[in-house]
Amino acid sequence: MPLTNTQIRYYDSNVLRLPKDKRETYNAQVDRLITALRKKLKDQDKITIKRVVKAGSFAKHTILRKTSDSQVDVDVVFYVSGEKVAEETFASLSEKIYEALLKMYPNKAVEDFEIQRKAATVSFVGTGLDVDIVPVIENPDKEGYGWQFDRIDGSKTETCAPCQIKFVKERKDQDPDFRTLVRLAKRWRTNMECPLKSFHIELIMAHVLEVNGKDGSLEKRFRDFLLYIAESGLKEVITFPENSTIPAFSHPVVILDPVCDTNNVTSRITEDERKEIVRIAEKSWATANFASVEGDYDIWKELFGRSFKVEDAA
């Protein structure tokens, strides 16, 4: 017997989705960090922060709640501008943010701080929160847009955090269950150790919505997500109505960023990883179909993990 929409929504609400009280706690913690860091950077390095945007899965409401082996991750985009920016490299901006965070939290262990390719990260073990501070050089001619730099290879990508949030909201307005399906797919990805990032999943799910529409049960639509990956092999170029031009890419997987035509968000997926993603999706689709026919919750746990449940314990 297939899972009902009510059962899947129960699982999403009680196991996957970040509860309202936790969201409020994290929001308050992030707001305090933003206020302190903004002041620290201005006083310490004369860096002007023109705008701050909470971004990523947290802002899109597709984030999963904290588990025993995963933190809640919040992206905070700092739009940087002013004459001082011209004197800085992106690496130095990340370094200055990292140094400011160290000074702001002198009692935290050094391993709670990290400089990544495009962000400086601070981890709060007590609340289970990771905050990625992402510096973006503001484009004064395009509202919400700016350039995000890679600290390792020096490449830059145009981005628009508010536009990415709007993209998901518009899909949710079109399909009230869009975020539920994204969270289902993210839990599947994590449990199956599939090398897809959260942003990739959001975009693939949006593409499947565009192609198939919102008809059908939630269970079937999740299976259709797996089926799309399995049948396409992720060899099709995925674009969106927001894209105006389609450049040619040579990467194994091409999914265009809906806010930047020149950005292939899957450019770092290797051919071996593409094959692995497709292999996992094929196997998972078969497992999901078998679980649906058998009506066996234990089989669903093979896809979603031991925490999978669709009703209160008796």
From Swiss-Prot:
> Where are its TM segments located?
none
Could you list this entry's UniProt keywords, alphabetically sorted: Antiviral defense, ATP-binding, Magnesium, Metal-binding, Nucleotide metabolism, Nucleotide-binding, Nucleotidyltransferase, Transferase
Q: Name one GO biological process term.
A: defense response to virus
**GO molecular-function annotation terms?**
2'-5'-oligoadenylate synthetase activity; ATP binding; double-stranded RNA binding; metal ion binding
Cofactor(s) this protein requires: Mg(2+)
| Top-level EC class as recorded in UniProt | transferase
Binding-site list for ATP: K60, D75, K186, K197, S198, F199, N263
Which Pfam families does this entry report, sorted A to Z? SMODS (PF18144)
Binding residue positions for Mg(2+): D73, D75
- EC number, as in UniProt: 2.7.7.-
Question: Is the keyword ATP-binding assigned to this protein?
Answer: yes
**One cellular component (GO) term of this entry:** membrane
> Any idea what job this protein has?
Cyclic nucleotide synthase (second messenger synthase) of a CBASS antivirus system. CBASS (cyclic oligonucleotide-based antiphage signaling system) provides immunity against bacteriophage. The CD-NTase protein synthesizes cyclic nucleotides in response to infection; these serve as specific second messenger signals. The signals activate a diverse range of effectors, leading to bacterial cell death and thus abortive phage infection. A type III CBASS system.
Q: Which family does it belong to?
A: Belongs to the CD-NTase family. C01 subfamily.
Q: How does the annotation summarize its subunit structure?
A: Forms complexes with Cap7 with 1:1 and 2:2 stoichimetry, and a 1:1:6 CdnC:Cap7:Cap6 complex.
- Name under which the protein is recorded: CBASS oligonucleotide cyclase CdnC
Source species: Escherichia coli
